[in-house]
From Swiss-Prot:
It catalyses: ATP + H2O = ADP + phosphate + H(+). SMART domains: DEXDc (SM00487), HELICc (SM00490). Probable ATP-dependent RNA helicase involved in a variety of mitochondrial post-transcriptional processes and in translation. It is a key control element in nuclear-mitochondrial interactions. Residues 390-546 form the Helicase C-terminal domain. This is ATP-dependent RNA helicase SUV3, mitochondrial. It comes from Saccharomyces paradoxus (Yeast). It is found in: Mitochondrion. ATP binds at residues 239-246. GO terms for cellular component: mitochondrial degradosome. GO terms for biological process: mitochondrial RNA 3'-end processing. One of its GO terms (molecular function) is ATP binding. Its EC number is 3.6.4.13. Belongs to the helicase family. Residues 1-25 form a transit peptide.
Length: 737
């Protein structure tokens, strides 16, 4: 996987300009550079006002609209009440939006005001806009995002009931809401939309001096100004697997009033949440798919939160933040979340938990940020040994408590079936695309002895407490998305280190002991070399500009610039910049997700940024469902999960023994449901009826568990890559999507 690297060239946001494919750009008759990264005085595009009377281009404090009565017969001239409300509302909007501005904001806000008046002039001369048959939706009233329908909204605003208007305007006192109040709301929202979506993206920010646009994008430490205002105490807890480092960090977290545990997986976040709850420590849960607020009698949420690292509220003030598995900051796909959290959390203490391999990297970053650094190193609590010989008799030589490691879903299920066929051992399985809840169930069955053997992918490397006596590697090679590669020593140590954890007894007199082996001498030799090898220190941290910075950059591009173009431009520029301390997150998966909704013009840029981080699995059924969900956002509809045409009829107990309904179909359905939860947490007005969604989720988990338990043949055997992944059979047995 290619990592994009920064260089040392300074790259201030205000000099980020659109590259236009012309040889010369003229501004005030002077030649300017066509390079958008160096031209600081180029206005990309000035709005035109084709309908606004010329005398109003320079005179702003005009609130009435002037028409030739002999040529026009629009609603403004016909209806005195409409005219009076519109004139008064315009004066109020002017006073609120333009009269008390900072001098730097005046020119751009003035353009938004002129754009609003120009649009009203145009619509008042358009008979189609003046129909009374139009019934606005509630979402259009709450957030008018189509300025071209403004007059229609104003004419028909009274068709929305007063109780709804009271909720929209948050007016719980007055029983009567005037038409003027409604006009003011619609015009305010339309003005804001025009300013943010039409005017601001067309203008440069040459006069900004507040620092928001002057961040050196090649120095990620500067992205987080609030964190730079304080000197934080960075406390590292480093050591191998099973050294008690996470426990010590959590003990500190429990002792403070305001804190956040940031885990790599939502099941780990849930585990910490459940642990705190069982210890009577108040704690919230915050993951992309699930939010639980621990409220007291007065409705106040708990001060502590357990969540995933991507959900850390960067600008919220904390006493302690724990970043678990900090070595993940070098991960090409998700590393940005750890790096940005380390650089940006506003916390008195930041506890970093992870491998020693990250130590030099953290030292360099702390030197850059000016924070205080304390290092705590821990030794493994038990012994870990690599056996001298491979497992005798292959699969038949396995024993209760073994964990067999393979690196594909097909191989994991093949091994489960073969072990259960050739031995009397019962096998649990864990792999990445299994629902977290199913993984927890499988782990529990293995830990309590109901199942004898665990067969797992590298998903066991973090996030699950497993009572493993011995880790058995089937291979030392792993597919990295492009080719088979030999596993790194760090990966082997992470997985092999799971052996001997959470064991209260052992053959060494009470000291927990774990063993590592393989089925083949060649693999065992490679594993031994990795376990005994010196630490491979990480050299770079993966990062990505925050949504706020991306949004500021987007204001330098003309309206309609594809989101993917912006992200690719950032990537290309940063590839030529900065030192080797930071690398840019891999864009492939993000661009693939963006491609599903980029053509939807009604989704604002800020929402497209948000949606680019959605957890969309690369399965046909999942991507199609996500596209439908995005259409809901674009149309501002309100829908429940059951209103979509998805095969929820397969969530039937009678489908469990039917092998034509494959395990992967249910994994796809599960991913669709969790994706719906993710979207509902961000768009609660569009995605509703969470109770039904929860019922579907629980039933899907149950069917996946039962299908694993009754597995007779591998559903992935002999399937060409990508041929029917995530598809489901129709009632006639044919595959459809």
């Amino acid at each position: 996987m290619t990592l994009v690297k920064y260089s040392t060239i300074a790259f201030p946001l205000r000099s980020f300009r659109l590259f236009i494919f012309v040889k010369k750009a003229l501004y005030h008759n002077e030649p300017h550079s066509i390079d958008p990264f160096h031209d600081k005085n180029w206005i990309v595009k000035r709005p035109k006002f084709l309908n606004l009377p010329k005398n109003e281009h320079s005179k702003l404090d005009v609130f009435q609209f002037n028409f030739n009565k002999s040529k026009s017969n629009n609603v403004y001239l016909r209806d005195p009440l409409f005219r009076d409300n519109l004139d008064k509302a315009m004066q109020i909007i002017y006073n609120e939006k333009l009269s008390s501005l900072d001098a730097k904001q005046v020119p751009i806000k003035n353009l938004a005001w002129l754009k609003l008046r120009d649009s009203i002039y145009q619509q008042l001369e358009d008979p189609k806009q003046q129909t009374k048959n139009y019934v606005p939706s509630i979402s259009e009233i709450i957030y008018p995002s189509s300025p071209g329908n403004l007059i229609s909204l104003l004419i028909n605003c009274n068709k929305i009931g007063n109780s709804v208007w009271k909720s929209i305007l948050k007016n719980g006192q007055s029983n009567n809401i005037s038409t003027l109040d409604k006009f003011i709301h619609v015009l305010q929202q339309t003005f804001d939309h025009m300013y943010e979506q039409e005017i601001l993206p067309m203008m440069t920010n040459t006069d900004d001096t507040d620092g928001a646009h002057n961040v050196d994008i090649t120095n990620p430490a500067e992205w987080f100004s609030e964190a730079r205002k304080i000197r934080r105490h960075i406390i590292m807890h480093i050591g191998p697997t099973n050294s008690g480092k996470t426990y010590r960090a959590l003990q500190k977290l429990k002792s403070v009033d305001r804190g956040y545990y940031a885990g790599p997986l939502r099941l780990l976040a849930r585990e910490v949440y459940d642990r705190f709850q069982s210890e009577k420590v108040r704690c919230n849960l915050l993951t992309g798919e699930e939010v639980i607020r621990d409220l007291d009698d007065k409705g106040n949420p708990a001060g502590l939160t357990s969540g995933t690292v991507e959900m850390v509220p960067i600008n919220q003030k904390f006493d302690v933040v724990v970043l678990d598995e900090i070595q993940m900051m070098s991960d090409a796909d998700r590393g940005w979340a750890w790096t940005n959290a380390l650089l940006g959390v506003v916390s008195k203490e930041v506890h970093l938990v992870g491998e020693k391999s990250v130590l030099p990297l953290v030292k360099s970053i702390v030197k850059m940020t000016g924070d205080k650094l304390t290092i705590n190193e821990y030794e493994r609590l038990g012994k870990l040994s690599v056996e001298d010989k491979p497992v005798k008799d292959g699969i038949k030589g396995l024993r209760k408590g073994d964990c067999v490691v393979a690196f594909s879903k097909k191989k994991v299920l093949d091994l489960k079936l073969k072990i259960e066929k050739d031995t009397n051992l019962k096998v649990a399985v864990i792999y990445g695309s299994l629902p977290p809840e199913t993984r927890v169930q499988q782990a529990a069955l293995f830990n309590n002895g109901e199942y004898d053997i665990m067969v797992a992918s590298d998903a066991i490397g973090m996030g699950l407490n497993l009572s493993i006596d011995r880790v058995v590697f089937t291979t030392n090679m792993k597919y990295n998305g492009e080719e088979l590669m030999e596993m790194t020593s760090s990966q082997i140590k992470q997985i092999g280190g799971r052996a001997g954890r959470f064991k209260s007894k052992s053959t060494s007199g009470g000291v927990p002991q774990g063993f590592i082996t393989s089925f083949e001498s060649k693999v065992l030799k490679s594993v031994r070399k990795a376990i005994e090898s010196p630490i491979e220190y990480l050299k770079t941290a993966v990062t990505w500009p925050t949504d706020e910075i991306c949004a500021q950059l987007m204001t330098q591009f003309p309206p309609g610039t594809p989101t993917s173009d912006l992200l690719q431009t950032i990537s290309d520029e940063l590839e030529r910049s900065s030192d080797n301390l930071f690398t840019l997150s891999d864009l492939k998966s993000k661009l693939k997700v963006i491609g599903l909704f980029e053509h939807m013009e009604d989704i604002p840029f800020f929402d497209k940024l948000k949606l680019s981080n959605a957890p969309v699995k690369d399965m046909p059924m999942v991507t199609k469902a996500f596209t439908k969900f995005c259409e809901t956002i674009a149309k501002r509809h309100t829908r429940g999960l059951l209103s979509y045409r998805l095969p929820f009829n397969l969530l039937d107990y009678n489908c469990i023994p039917n092998e034509s309904y494959s395990l992967e179909v249910y994994e796809s359905l599960y991913n669709i449901i969790t994706l719906y939860f993710w979207l509902s947490n961000r768009y609660p007005n569009y995605f509703i009826d969470m109770e039904s969604a929860k019922d579907l989720k629980y039933f899907c988990e149950m069917i996946i568990f039962e299908k694993l338990d009754r597995l007779k043949k591998n559903p992935y055997a002999h399937k060409p890559f990508g041929s029917t992944r995530g598809q489901f059979p129709s009632s006639r047995g044919r595959l459809r999507t």
